[in-house]
Amino acid sequence: AQYRVSEQNPVPIARNIIAAKIQASKRVLQRQIRNYGENEAIQSAVDALNISLRQLKGAAELDVVRGIEGDAAARYFCVFGQLLSEKSGFSFDGRNRRPPRDGVNALLSFVYSILGKDISGALQGVGLDPQVGFLHADRPGRDSLAQDILEEFRAWWADRLVLSLINRGQIKPQDFVTEASGAVSLKAEARKLLFQALQAKKQEKIVHPFLGEEVEIGLLPYIQAMLLARHLRGDLSEYSPFLMR
C-alpha cells in the first residue's frame, strides 16, 4: 500500500505533513512575540505563514505543495536569527547545510540528523520502507519517508531545543571548530552536551494531540510511524501528523 500511495496519490499525506510543519513553525514565532513583545518582522513572517496555510488547502499537486513548503521555510528562517538572544554571541543569516557554515546551522543539522535516524528506525519497526516517501522524492541512499515525518518535528522539537541551548548559554560560539573548507562542526564536549539535552527532552511527557494519552516525547517517531502505517492499511481515514495544540 505504501508504494501504491507514494506513486498514485501522495498529495493528501504530503499536504497534511506540511500543514503541521507550517503551523508548528508559526507557533515558534508567535511564542517569541508573546514572550518578548511585538516585532514587525516576526509578525510579518507569521502573516506569510498564514497565507501559506490557506494556499495549501487548495494544493492538488505535489510540486505546488513543495513550492508552498519552500516559501514558508524561507520566511521562517528569514527571521529565525531574531529568536537568538543578543548576548548569546551567535548570529544566523539563513539556513545552509552540506556542510553547515556557522554554529546555529551546525546545531540544526546535527539535531535533524539524529531525529531522522530515530524516525527511520521507527518506520522499519512498523513495517514501512523509510526510503519511499510522499513529499520528498525518492533518491538512492536517502530515507525520504523519514525526511517526510521529520518535517513535523523540526520546529517544535529540534529548533526549539537548539534555541533553548543557545539562549540559556549552555552552548557557546567557542564550542565549534571551522575546517579549512569553511565547514563548521561541534567540538566533542558540546556534542556530548547536545546528546544529553536530546535524551532529557525524550524523557519529558506530553499529551499526544491525536491519541489523547500521555506519552514520552522519545516515543513520538514510533507513534507517528504507527499512525501512518494504520492509515496506509486502511484503518484510519487520514494520516494525522504530529501537531501540538
PLM regions: where:
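Active-site helix-to-loop segments that bind/position phosphate- or nucleotide-bearing substrates
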Residues: 2-245
